[in-house]
């Protein structure tokens, strides 16, 4: 019966190596039938080329990381920037694994290499066939997905080249492998190092395959979510081709010319809009009966007239709006809103309704449109302290980590499978924080908040007319939960001499979700629109 020793003892021929052909061999301590590739000129050429490709990939990755914080021409400024970062990281890991484990390729690694290459090919098709991904990412961002695929294809092809050379140098490979002697090594030459390398490369290859599956599913979900039609209109602003979403409803030809302009908070404005839309569409009978409502005072209607024009918009990165270049301050964002309103032919007077961080934006907007703003309603809104806190190092770091991991879509996939979240939830609902566009917008706020945006806000607050009606409505739960929140609300209550501060006990941050909070918002809004504001 043949043994591995018998195989190793076969007579030498013209193909036999005179010296051991791999690193670390000493006087025949390693069997001839090793699965290590010979260190031929082809091997060295492939290795040096892979090292060069790895260096190029790492340099691109570093530039892409810089682009998240400061826009550079390397990719489209409409892109959140995290997708190319993720795919260059994946390409770098693939090349690093090839360089580390090229001495001892194995069957599991070869299988996963081909699976990853196939998955990346599908990724390329998705990003180039999806209209929304082509628009938001641009061809330069999508090119990095193609780069990751080409690096994976390079690894597969070079492995085939080396494997073919190996089989030429070992004509008995197929027979040995078929009889099962290829792995039969004597205890005296047991390759513990090689077993460890085999295990590590197999585990890493499986992990990379899973991560590549995640990137594919995430791209498909992004393309699917992006196909959701936007209510209202998308307006192209500035020369950047960025599109912002603006929706107006109600009559623009009614006797009441006031426009209610709603600014969202930490997520898209649409959860707030849906509540306001229901009230704005209140039947005329209920509208007339509202005069008998308990909170009716001084002929003030607690519901909006059905013909009142209400406009809502999504800030860059929220809802259907594109991201813009970095850095962007509150003032820059408000310039985009002004341009969108001009294109939509929506003029004042305005009554501003702002929720959460949106209070900062509405404050700056009011200062830039002093003659057109009729009043402001702050709904548990932030101010200067909110901008200061947004620049904390831990907050920035966690946002960056979330963005760096966003191409994997862990939260998106988890929410869709286990929590039943729909694309409506991911685009404009409370689950929109899982979007890489949302993360990019929050990074923008954290970068400029403590500096540029804070100075813009302080300047805006100093020029507001002292007789401007301002309503500050604070959530009781927020007042109890956050230590600095009462002081910030007190600061807002001193904006003008006609500021009224209300605290809704036991109301959440989304004040309108409570009955008392919703009634109070409409009461204050009606007082500003129809008259009756306290002097």
Curated annotation (Swiss-Prot):
Superkingdom, natural source: Eukaryota
Pfam families on file: Abhydrolase_6, DUF2417
Membrane topology: Multi-pass membrane protein
GO molecular function, one term: hydrolase activity
GO cellular component: cytoplasm; fungal-type vacuole membrane
Entry keyword annotation includes Transmembrane: yes
Main location: membrane
Statement: the UniProt record of this protein carries the keyword Transmembrane helix: yes
Subcellular location(s) per record: Membrane
Keywords: Membrane, Transmembrane, Transmembrane helix
Transmembrane domains' residue ranges: 55-75, 82-102, 115-135, 143-163, 201-221, 346-366
Protein name from the UniProt record: Uncharacterized protein C23C11.06c
